[in-house]
């Protein structure tokens, strides 16, 4: 089917027919600028009978011939077969291997559209075969939405981490402190979950099931005084100040202040009417004596001016006084009642004196009843307290008795343990004393025995001396010759024994010298480093009692006699290779980089090698002197020269110096052993 929009149809009508057969479908270059929502593409479908059926939208315009290309009519018309050959694009042949759905629209260039004049009516020849279609454009890259995914994953990860932190905070106190301190709203979340868990576990905990219902307190109707009462603005203002019975004043106390108000209080300022008794008015009030009926009347006297009062004196009602200082509820009730009396006294005391007196009696009865109830409660409480004290005393006595019994048992147990321990210690000390006495007795007996033996020897010596003297006196000539003979024989025996020791020492010295020569021969005749553990073990066995030889052998490094030491020729050959590498790094500083290495390598090629015995501390002079010492066989001086190097030169010659040190240590130890052997020979002589 062929579907096209109005914009595409108008562009086809305004453009000439392309003379070439390569463009199968015509498309304006401006079609890309149209809205993508109204763009439609070709879709060709071949019916079984081979006829091509075109279906146009109701808003599309059909073209019947070439002369009607410039019309802008929007009427729809079904084209006939001849019109299809003129205006419709060439349909693909039935033998084509390409499917119509896979063929894309090829845009028409503006230059090719303008080549044919608008008035040209020559029909385009139908191509014999359809050209191969152009390759499809690459599909647009799909939107990855990395930022959206990143934000989504970040939000989910943060939420999971936060929920995990809240959950773990309910199980770990240390993590709870960390989480509530650093996590935002962490403490509120944890507290909310704890409260919710508590409500789930104890649903009736917040209900007031165990509390006693308190009856509402009947305070009566609230008494108010009109604000506009009085004759002048000044008195009305004072009345407004005194109308608030909740402020501090004489009416707030039902005991102390009412005792002082037994005398009659008259109104000081009659122009403003009757006001409540405030502390400022107490100073200006004039006190009068009480009347016998309980109602106190006194004509008012103005303190400020000496003129007569404009209003006649009024009577007042005495306040209620109850001796219940330690009952706050009764005090509050009396205070409220006295406030009412104050208000009534200010308005019409004579009309309410009867009910007020009756109320006073009722309140006094209530006060007495409260005092009686209080005394009964105090008596019952005191009784309970006494009973509790008695039970506590009894329990304390039982506890003290139990503690005394336990203490006595512990004391008996400790005493038995103490006696057993004391007996054990006494027995052990007795055994020690017996042992010491026995040893002292044995020592004394041995001392006495030794003294007896010494005395016997001394007596025997004296006896022999006496006998000798007697015999010499008798036989002076023969005995004297015998004594000389005995002394000569003893001297010969002594010399014989001494020479046997000398022979043994010489034999050991010779064996030691032979073992040292064997070690030296092994080291000098080996071309490669060779271990000399057996030779060194023989030397150590021959001089096992000599501390100097043992110290010399211990000074040799285990690596030296386990792996062997290089020969002098090997050291010289290795020195030459090491000297070449040291000369390459002779110009490098300690913290050299790649540039310094390259510069040192280049400059080393142009440097001249020194000969003889040059003076100086540079690397080349040191290497020359060390090489001369090696040629002379002086390893010690060569090692000293190489040890004076610094930086990279010393680092490169570190292994060679270690080998030279091991060789010097072995040679020095062998020299010490040989010297010790010679000293032995000299001591014998």
Swiss-Prot record:
Keywords: Coiled coil, Membrane, Mitochondrion, Mitochondrion inner membrane, Transit peptide, Transmembrane, Transmembrane helix. Residues 68-99 have a biased composition (Polar residues). Residues 124-142 have a biased composition (Pro residues). Residues 20-149 are mitochondrial matrix. Residues 1-19 form a transit peptide. Residues 51-67 have a biased composition (Low complexity). It is a single-pass membrane protein. It comes from the Eukaryota. Residues 170-685 are mitochondrial intermembrane. One of its GO terms (cellular component) is MICOS complex. Residues 259-271 have a biased composition (Basic and acidic residues). Its main location: mitochondrion. InterPro entries: MIC60. It is found in: Mitochondrion inner membrane. Residues 356-456 form a coiled coil. Residues 49-144, 209-305 are annotated as: Disordered. One of its GO terms (biological process) is cristae formation. Pfam families: Mitofilin (PF09731). Component of the MICOS complex, a large protein complex of the mitochondrial inner membrane that plays crucial roles in the maintenance of crista junctions, inner membrane architecture, and formation of contact sites to the outer membrane. Plays a role in keeping cristae membranes connected to the inner boundary membrane. Also promotes protein import via the mitochondrial intermembrane space assembly (MIA) pathway. Component of the mitochondrial contact site and cristae organizing system (MICOS) complex. Belongs to the MICOS complex subunit Mic60 family. This is MICOS complex subunit MIC60. It comes from Paracoccidioides brasiliensis (strain Pb03). The lineage of its organism: Eukaryota, Fungi, Dikarya, Ascomycota, Pezizomycotina.
